[in-house]
Amino acid sequence: MNVKEYMQQLGQAARKASRLLARADTNQKNAALHAIADAIVREQEALLAANRQDLDAARQAGLDDAMLDRLTLSAKGVLAMADGLRQIAALPDPVGEIDDMCYRPSGIQLGKMRVPLGVVGIIYEARPNVTADAAGLCLKSGNATILRGGSEAFHSNQAIAACVHEGLAAAGLPAEAVQVLATTDRAAVGELIAMPEYVDVIVPRGGKGLIARISAEARVPVIKHLDGNCHVYIDDTANPDKAFNIALNAKTHRYGTCNTMETLLVHTAFAEFMLPRLAEAYWEKGVELRGCERVRAILGEPVKAATDEDWATEYLAPVLAVKVVKDIDEAIEHINRWGSHHTDAIVTEDYGRSRRFLREVDSASVMVNASTRFADGFEYGLGAEIGISTDKIHARGPVGLNGLTSQKWIVLGDGQVRS
């Protein structure tokens, strides 16, 4: 069987399973999630052995330390996967929820019911835990899923898939509800993103190159974000302590996440007071600063000159671009021009400016007096997330269970006909 035939077979099976899964009630889905979690705990040694096999191959292939870190499963990580599935089971089931019921003049009753998307294709790199997270979220939201993990995590993903299938069987659900590709052939990705008759949406999770390729080539809708070029703007009305703590946390809490601040904007009236204090804190943590001419005039030689490339870059590293702006107008203009529409924050004590920032900054998450690091499914109360979307359709921001559903109109009548 060639790759095209294999993927067609998976797609057909997923479509059939999606119809069965859409009918499954909450108790059955939760039973499957708990059974999968139990299987993961029970098969911990097998999972770790499979992961060691992947790690050995990765080292022989010369993968860097960052990739090895993402690939590594620990005993603690295995238990965390199981706990994550139990947390998904504890979340409210969005499927079947009915909103906005109302009577129309004709006498019909109208509303919207939340329903699964159908079949979700998920393409990701390195992290084996994504296999369990993605399977759990799709299962709870009533979607069948086809998972394509990175080839470097092949054995880990297959071992996790075996636990998933064991849990599905225990709950009386079809194994085809969650299918993990049993091939490392890259042609499988091209087939997966070009099967609109079987796949309803694609969610890519990985590097910019992967996501850009899928966005360009997919014949199926894509939920994605390319970059996390996030900003914090410190207004001249900001509380100095709030500004310091937020600007420090947003950059240094973790460097490699998509909600980490990459550019700091400071009002000109606040710059000479705030920048030296912040710079010392950044330098203590090993953060390299790249600034505009005004920033360099205030802070001196340690600051490299920032270029347009710096304003546009998601560093994912201890590097920060810093710019002094004359007012909120320039701050908003800079963010909307150079940002990635992911997450941006203002620090201000002025109510009018905070509301203006919320209205005019064109990002999936816009914050007032809070760190950009809060842009996260768990922090938003969504539970686990499948990813973060910077698109405006279909989902925007952290995508949890609700983001894996859509709504259909329902009409209840009592014999009405249209005149």
Swiss-Prot record:
It catalyses: L-glutamate 5-semialdehyde + phosphate + NADP(+) = L-glutamyl 5-phosphate + NADPH + H(+). It is an enzyme of class 1 (oxidoreductase). Its main location: cytoplasm. InterPro entries: Ald_DH/histidinol_DH, Ald_DH_C, Ald_DH_N, Aldehyde_DH_dom, G-glutamylP_reductase_CS, Glu-5-SA_DH, GPR_dom. GO terms for molecular function: glutamate-5-semialdehyde dehydrogenase activity; NADP binding. Its EC number is 1.2.1.41. Pathway: Amino-acid biosynthesis; L-proline biosynthesis; L-glutamate 5-semialdehyde from L-glutamate: step 2/2. It comes from the Bacteria. GO terms for biological process: L-proline biosynthetic process. GO terms for cellular component: cytoplasm. CDD domains: ALDH_F18-19_ProA-GPR. Keywords: Amino-acid biosynthesis, Cytoplasm, NADP, Oxidoreductase, Proline biosynthesis. Disulfide bonds: none annotated. It is found in: Cytoplasm. Catalyzes the NADPH-dependent reduction of L-glutamate 5-phosphate into L-glutamate 5-semialdehyde and phosphate. The product spontaneously undergoes cyclization to form 1-pyrroline-5-carboxylate. Belongs to the gamma-glutamyl phosphate reductase family. This is Gamma-glutamyl phosphate reductase.
